[in-house]
Amino acid sequence: MYNFASTSDGADMIHTGRHFLQIPGPTNVPDRILRAMDSPVIDHRSAEFANLGKEVLEGMRGIFKTSGHVVLYPASGTGAWEAAIVNTLSPGDRVLLFETGHFSSLWRGVAEKFGVQVDYVPGNWRRGASAAELESRLAADRGHAIKAVMVVHNETSTGVTSRIPELRRALDSARHPALLLVDTISSLASIDYRHDEWGVDVTIAGSQKGLMLPPGMSFNALSEKALRVTENAKLPRSYWDWQEMLKPNRSGFFPYTPPTNLLYGLREALLMLREEGLANVFRRHDRHAEATRAAVRAWGLEIVCEEPREYSSSLTAVFVPEGHDADKLRAVILEHFDMSLGAGLSKFAGKVFRIGHLGSFNDLMLAGTLCGVEMGLRLAGVPHKEGGVMAALNSLAAPQKKSEPATMAR
């Protein structure tokens, strides 16, 4: 007979139910997408595959809100960073990049490894890119030595969202021809973004956040100006070359063996986003972000982002009080409640924890997440006030704007 007596001595906690993955990406992959990916691999030179390729490339245009080309790579977002650089720049070119957090710093490193000169505009990691600073620097660049402006739209390490339309207006006001390159890895399909309307030349994105997929795919959305510039860009490129990609893309194919099962998942993700409607997706993320901030305020803790207009709708980064360790808090929450929160990165290591609320997410999931945080604060001995969860529930219960018809117009 089976012996169903416990084999645990109580030293190790046995977790039941699903793990709560509340880092700001990779995010929870919905069952629908998992089932779609669980399909036989097909011939990637077949008519069936061509239909799949054309469908997902067209669908991604709707997500980026562009009528232009979208390039898809089997790579993480870092690959799409590199692709944006090598297709538009030459050795010795100058670019302007705003320090908004850990990931702007990493993007700077990629550019510098290719011999690009980076004018790194310093920041305190608590505010987004400054349109006034951008206009001032571009106005001073009368010889147009600056070839590109590089901005992280939503800084995943800090929960700060830069205001891209204001940066575009600064470029236009300065009458400067620099390209505008924008990283939307943690904002695409979570926060309103408009590639064409906002005059962005290259948008960078990844699969593992708002698109609700596993890691493994990344994207560049391209303006016609970016495509013209690439003809004279001298940085070495092969795998990342847009022109090599766009030729077979016209018929739904790729110049490499594509990640077929991820493309199945992407097709299902696009269908889910279309069913909900992008405007409603953004509204849902806004609600969950505001409810999370209500909880943080009720706890008496400090939100990293200093400017309310720059609050992120995909994650909230929170300081722990001086003298306490955010990583120890995260460890307590993981041990007791089987929930993962995002760590503080670089200079915020041990000082900040990050709550992800993006992708496939609903009110009850948020309530459970915030319950786990509040119980963890108590268990870890982190000074806080009670009532954060109730503040979030009250926020969620507030009257909502009427949902819009589910459309995903380009």
What are these regions (language model features)?
Residues 4, 347, 351-410:
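PLP-dependent enzyme catalytic core of the Aspartate aminotransferase-like
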Residues 302-336:
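Conserved PLP-binding catalytic core of the aspartate aminotransferase-like
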Residues 129-188, 202:
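Active-site phosphate-binding strand-loop segment of PLP-dependent enzymes
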Residues 18-74, 78:
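A glycine-/small-polar-enriched, mobile loop at the entrance of the PLP active site in fold-type I
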Residues 28-29, 208-298:
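Active-site C-terminal subdomain of aminotransferase-like
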Residues 67-96, 100, 104-108:
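Conserved beta-loop-alpha segment that forms the PLP phosphate-binding cup at the N-terminus of a helix
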Residues 196-208:
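Conserved active-site segment immediately N-terminal to the catalytic lysine
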Residues 1-40, 392, 400-410:
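N-terminal glycine-rich, Lys/His-bearing helix-loop that initiates the first secondary-structure elements
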